[in-house]
Regions:
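N-terminal glycine-rich phosphate-binding loop for ADP-containing cofactors
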Residues: 1-382
């Protein structure tokens, strides 16, 4: 099957990611089915789509006629079988719980047409493991959108061990038709590209707070002052502290115990303070986006530390064959974050030797093996 053959897309899950992906499909001209387990979830997701389309009409990005046509192109369901029975492409967007994803894919495989491609929007988890629950592992692929799906350009297209080249190419071409920037992930590796490169910075940011070395506002103010649209702690809140927590647990199980979530983050989770989605997390979101006091900027904090950690992890992706080139990593990082600049592009401006030295110092100071510089970073021939 080619991308041109796709007429109807089913999205499983109507939450933040699910309804966003459904809207992306509508904007690209597809018929869409959106499913969730309770009517209230479906109605809330559909309501969010309507609100978003209304805003696009106000901004004159779509016409009112187009808005009505798109709303006429979406159906909602509670039953997975009904939602996917005539789909050409299905995208799962349920919470990051492996057992839940496996259950969903068993149901999709049983009910979807034989030609249909089954994609997971997982941000971290093994596509290969998910695919093993189906009788069509060659037609199972990772298709990782970023939040908010309508605005963010990056889509990671992840190859499981048995994913066919036809499935990869069709999914890549579908992302292009959705006006996204797809990046091929050639090896099913935990965290893929964007989240894998950023994951070690979560260790560092957590350690700074855990040890009382900084406050989140001091770092965010510093990063905002140098031009970042959002500081790293505010971004954690925006995505959801639960996502960071469970992602950390998964990385700890699959890659290194260094990723084990810190006590301060666990306390936030236990208190139900998950960030924007609950109105409170690291910051207070009850009145909208938190105000960051730029006068509290920690001026002696060197942003090169974060770049060093990211560049070091990015070299591991090259060494492991997760992607084919440094350019693909830079495309992912530039499109997924909002800075518009790739990790290696920034690293070259600072110097690989300096960054390797920073990583050595961090590994020694914090006792974190993940921070140890790779041979690729030391040599700098990237």
């Amino acid at each position: 099957m080619k991308a041109e053959d796709i007429k109807k897309i089913t999205v499983i899950g109507a939450g933040d990611m699910g309804h966003g992906i459904a809207e992306v499909a509508l904007l690209a001209g597809y018929r869409v089915a959106m499913q969730d387990i309770e009517q209230r979830f479906v109605e809330r997701g559909l309501g969010r789509i309507k609100e978003s389309l209304d805003k696009l009409v106000e901004k004159q990005k779509v016409t009112d006629e187009n808005r009505k046509a798109m709303l006429g192109n979406i159906e909602t369901f509670l039953d997975i079988g009904e939602a996917v029975k005539d789909a050409d492409f299905a995208i799962e967007a349920v919470p990051e719980i492996m057992d839940l994803k496996k259950k969903v894919f068993e149901q999709l495989d049983a009910a979807a047409p034989k030609h249909a491609i089954l994609a997971s929007n997982t941000s971290n988890m093994s596509v290969t493991e998910i695919a093993l629950t189906t009788k069509r592992p060659d037609q199972v692929v990772g298709m990782h959108f970023f939040n908010p799906a309508v605005m963010m350009k990056l889509v990671e297209v992840i190859k499981g061990e048995k994913t066919s080249e036809e499935t990869m190419q069709t999914t890549y071409d579908l992302a292009l038709k959705m006006n996204k920037v797809p990046v091929r992930v050639e090896k099913d590796s935990i965290g893929f590209v964007y989240n894998r490169v950023n994951a070690p910075t979560q260790i560092y940011l957590s350690l700074l707070v855990e040890r009382g070395m900084v406050t989140p506002e001091e770092i965010d103010a510093r990063m905002r002052k140098i031009g970042m649209p959002m500081g790293p702690y505010e971004l954690m809140d925006y995505v959801g502290l639960d996502v960071a927590y469970y992602g950390g647990q998964y990385f700890a199980e699959r890659i290194s115990r260094d990723y084990e979530p810190s006590d301060w983050l666990k306390k936030k989770i236990d208190a139900g303070e998950l960030g924007k989605k609950t109105g409170k997390g690291i910051f207070d979101w009850s009145k909208g986006r938190p105000e960051i006091d730029l006068s509290k900027s920690k001026e002696d904090f060197d942003p090169a530390v974060l770049i060093a950690i990211q560049a070091n992890e990015a070299t591991k992706l090259l060494e492991e064959g997760v992607v084919t080139s440094a350019e693909e990593i830079d495309k992912a990082m530039a499109s997924g974050g909002g800075s518009g600049i790739g990790t290696f592009q920034m690293a070259r401006g600072i110097g690989f030797e300096k960054l390797a030295g920073i990583c050595e110092d961090l590994a020694r100071e914090f006792g974190v093996k993940v921070f140890e510089p790779t041979e690729t970073l030391r040599k700098g021939n990237i």
